Amino acid sequence: NTSVLGVIPYFHLDIEDEDSLTERFRKKSRSGLAKIAVIRLPRISNFTDIAPLEAVDELDVSYVSNISQFGDPDVVIIPGSKNTISDLLWMRQNGLEGKILRHAAKGGIVFGICGGYQMLGQSISDPTGAEQKGTVRGMGLLPVTTVFEQEKRRTRVSGRFAKVGG
């Protein structure tokens, strides 16, 4: 004897998931022409930036949250973060930063999106405590420094690859 007010049907809607509330992170890897490891940051944001890559059958996109899952990817992507300094320190503490740096040293490709891009630089400073007050050393892969201010400014940036081999 259960009272039922109504039934809500399930419809698969192809709309963006909310940050971190998704089945994507449970997705099993598949065989593809290129292996892409996306770092599963604890405070990941805008992970839907990766969705176009997931839609390409020839790409094996996997989300990595520890060194045992890292494998031997062709490309590593560090996505955006809601707290860049905390997530960089998390990668440093669990060994993922070292894995990424070794991958880059072997000629592997590393991309950073938003906060991930900032992590690839020389340093990240947050003098006002916009995210987490203090200054930390970046991964040192790009000649950039980041200084957070109370008011965020978003600007488009473009660049060119100097020379890509392979």
Model segments located where?
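Phosphate-binding active sites in nucleotide-utilizing proteins
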Residues: 35-38, 44-115, 119
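Cysteine-nucleophile active-site neighborhood
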Residues: 81-166
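C-terminal lobe/tail of nucleotide-utilizing enzymes
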Residues: 1-62, 66-74, 141-166
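Short low-complexity, flexible loop/linker segments enriched in glycine and/or proline
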Residues: 21-22, 77-79, 126-127
